[in-house]
Amino acid sequence: MLLFTAAVAVAAPLSLGTAAAQTTLVPAQDAASLLGSQQAQGAVIWSHGRSLLKECSLAPTPEYIGVFRAAGWDTFRLNRPRITDTLPASGAALAEAAETLKQRGYRRVVLAGQSFGAFISLIAAGRGDAVDAVIGTAPAAYGSAESNPGGFLQNASGLYDLLGAVRRARVALFFFDGDIFDPGGRGPVADRILAAHGLSHLVIDKPAGLSTHWAAAGTTFATQYASCLVGFAAARLAAGAFDCGAQGAPAQIAGMGGVTTPSPAPARFTSLPQGNSASVIDLESGRREDVNRVLRRR
């Protein structure tokens, strides 16, 4: 059963469906600071990862989610006990939460997730139209080469299947150097899939200065990408791939002027020509690589 706390509902508590026992949607900020559906820019639900050894529901919310709050969004997290945390059950629970927030009047619903949380965010985005954007950092659900040698590659193939099933949401994905759960090569393929489906998307592949599976949790990631992600989540962008300049690189969202956030170093976007839409950002070399050329080299 999915439980909504009173603070989340900004009303009476509400129990929904049977998606996952004791899975709970709670505020990721002080409950008194929630703006409510009529005043907030939208709602963000962050989903933690999954571990066989500890309860990831106790993990802190990453710093970049706080920038959404500062920009006028209401922020939540989906807490899931590991004993009941499966892709089908948690994906269904998250889809249910997104639908409920949309029905309660939030103009935008964004799902952000780390690792296993990224997978269930994409699952939810494939189940209905309530999800406006997905932010997935270090997506994984099938262990490492050491812990699951027979299934580790599903961190790639499973991801591709989920990307192909996204119905309408914008998708931002981050892959990090030194991630033991990453089979490698996922950035270009993910970009190609999203482009083929006509979805607005952002792929950041192994950015310099950010390494390991948990790179998105800290200050460095938030400083470089949080305000950019706020803009990506809020903007009405045409289909294609978009450049997210790190550290507040100046650019404009095509046809929209700029994106205003309270971040001290706001990053904005540049729309690429249609012929460049099938590309992935390579921050190590400082250029965008054509997907087909990258794949031919493999």
PLM ranges: what are they?
Residues 110, 133-135:
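Residue in the alpha/beta-hydrolase core beta-strand immediately N-terminal to the catalytic nucleophile
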Residues 67-84:
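Conserved alpha/beta-hydrolase
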Residues 36, 139-203:
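The feature captures the conserved acid-bearing segment of alpha/beta-hydrolase catalytic domains
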Residues 24-40:
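Short beta-strand-to-loop junctions in surface cap/lid or active-site-entrance loops
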Residues 197-269, 273-288, 292-295:
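C-terminal catalytic histidine-bearing segment of alpha/beta-hydrolase fold enzymes
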Residues 37-68:
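Short, surface-exposed "cap/lid" segments of acyl-processing enzymes
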Residues 84-104:
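Alpha/beta-hydrolase active-site loop
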Residues 112-121:
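Gly/Ala-rich beta-loop-alpha elbow adjacent to hydrolase catalytic centers
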